[in-house]
Design a protein with these regions (language model features):
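Short intrinsically disordered terminal tails
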Residues: 1, 172-173
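Short, well-structured alpha-helical interface segments that form or flank functional binding sites
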Residues: 31, 103, 142
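Short, charged surface segments at domain edges that flank catalytic/cofactor-binding sites
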Residues: 74-118
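Histidine-centered nuclease catalytic patch
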Residues: 120-149, 162-164
Length: 173
């Protein structure tokens, strides 16, 4: 259920509610993850959690406790699975980037119909940049399907901000 005023502004501007809901949902999950990362970067927390993850076969138990303790949020199985993958990627992150080949960039461009994932402008190999959906500084190159092609403008504005996608949602309609 959304407020009448929000519904009216979305309708006036032809902004689909399902798009807003999707972006807000992804923002919430990424915010939970960023809170966990901030916690892991304090003191010896990362080392302690790494030890807990090694001890338990079901890593989701450890991550679920982290989520509850740090954010107070309750997540479903799918959300827990996603956040657990992100936490493990953060812990296993390597300090150097993997260089992506043009062939892989072209495949991403084809999957995106040669449009920037955020602003939907037409792009090609020359005027686009390879981007990590979940910031490289958080998960490195450890996650599959964490890549997208953006126009240079969106990639530079986005940086590691998870809010940029939300902002662009309103600018494209």
């Amino acid at each position: 259920m959304i407020s009448d005023s929000l519904n009216k502004i979305l309708n006036r501007n032809n902004i689909p509610l399902d798009e807003v809901e999707k972006v807000v949902y992804e923002y919430i999950l990424q915010s939970i993850f960023e809170d966990i990362v901030a916690y892991l970067l304090e003191d010896n927390n990362k080392e302690n959690i790494m030890n807990n993850l090694r001890q338990f076969e079901d890593k989701e138990i450890v991550v679920n406790k982290l989520i509850l303790d740090i954010t107070g949020m309750k997540v479903n199985e799918s959300e827990l699975s996603t956040i657990t993958k992100w936490v493990i990627a953060f812990i296993e992150k390597k300090s150097s980037r993997i260089k992506i080949k043009d062939k892989e960039k072209i495949k991403l461009l084809e999957n995106q119909n040669y449009k920037c994932k955020l602003c939907k402008r037409e792009i090609d190999l020359c005027n686009s940049e390879y981007d990590h959906i979940i910031s490289w500084k958080l998960v490195g190159d450890e996650l599959e399907n964490n890549y997208q092609m953006l126009c240079k403008h969106c990639n530079r504005c986005k940086s590691s901000s998870i809010l940029y996608r939300f902002i662009m949602l309103f600018k494209k309609y």
